[in-house]
Design a protein with these regions (language model features):
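Compositionally biased terminal segments of proteins
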Residues: 1-146
Length: 146
């Protein structure tokens, strides 16, 4: 990824954010999440995940929904923290010329008892993304489905 490409993408995102009167940090976060999801879609892990939550609604509806700063994923397969971390580290090393570099070493995971009464848990992963002059943490939650 060239610095000029990253700077160009950042400038276009700034213009889009200004035109929509949207918080620029939210625009950058959404772009980062979308690029993370792109990497997931091109990876060997793609068949094991489904997008859900507010980010999905953003794709379906023209009417703005509540702002979200993470991606909610329904995951199939192992849900132990080490497996979740390995998936996100794999995604971080996929190179795409989109102005973002994800840092595999920055992946941090957490366990969560999500809907414990329903019999499934989950976990989350957070990683650092860098673009032209900006570093941000992006989060994704993975929920287990049986």
């Amino acid at each position: 990824m060239s610095k000029n490409r990253a700077a160009s993408i950042r400038a276009r995102l700034k213009n889009r954010s200004d035109a929509a009167k949207q918080d620029f940090n939210l625009t950058l976060t959404h772009y980062g999440l979308e690029r993370l999801l792109y990497r997931l879609s091109t990876s060997k892990h793609a068949p094991n995940f489904l997008l859900k939550g507010a980010l999905l609604f953003k794709l379906w509806y023209v009417v703005p929904q509540r702002p979200t700063r993470d991606a909610d994923l329904l995951g199939l397969g192992p849900d132990d923290i080490d497996s979740v971390a390995a998936v996100f580290r794999d995604l971080c090393v996929i190179e795409v010329d989109d102005g973002i570099a994800f840092e595999a070493g920055s992946v941090k995971t957490k366990t969560a008892e999500i809907r414990k009464e329903a019999g499934y848990g989950g976990g989350g992963a957070c990683r650092t993304a860098r673009d032209a002059g900006r570093c941000a943490a992006l989060a994704a939650d993975r929920h287990r489905f049986w």
